[in-house]
A protein has these predicted regions:
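Terminal amphipathic alpha-helical/low-complexity segments used for targeting or macromolecular assembly
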Residues: 1-58
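Left-handed beta-helix
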Residues: 57, 63, 68-71, 76-77, ...
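Conserved small/polar residues in nucleotide/adenosyl-binding loops
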Residues: 117-118
């Protein structure tokens, strides 16, 4: 039987209250706080924190930045995300090399049942 994280990564219905997923979101929240408040958008601490939060990002993200997990965001070399973006990365988000994303952009992969029969 597949765990809830595996279901989420496969694009299937999953329980977001699962302990592993809750721990992953809590970790992302702590790293986002460090990135958005303590790192000031530059330097080794910023690059290290961004790498911990989003290990598949090869570009630059301006703060403030918000995501659910971080590990589901893939950005190519030379890509740039401007201020105040939200990436809800319950499913993979793939951004190609050299892509420029403006301020306040939201990339939302979250889904939920739209029929009471699925609840």
């Amino acid at each position: 039987m597949r765990g809830e994280k595996e279901k989420m990564l496969a694009g299937e219905w999953f329980d977001p209250h699962d302990a592993e997923l809750t721990a992953d979101r809590d970790r992302a929240t702590r790293l986002m706080h460090r990135l958005n408040v303590e790192c000031c958008g530059h330097g080794d601490d910023y690059r290290t924190t961004l790498g911990e939060l989003c290990p598949n990002v090869r570009g630059f993200i301006r703060e403030p930045f918000h995501c659910d997990y971080g590990y589901n965001i893939h950005m190519g070399e030379g890509s740039f995300v401007n201020f105040d973006c939200v990436f809800l990365d319950l499913a993979p988000i793939r951004i190609g090399c050299g892509t420029l994303i403006g301020p306040k952009v939201q990339l939302l992969t979250a889904h939920h049942p739209v029929s009471y029969t699925h609840l």
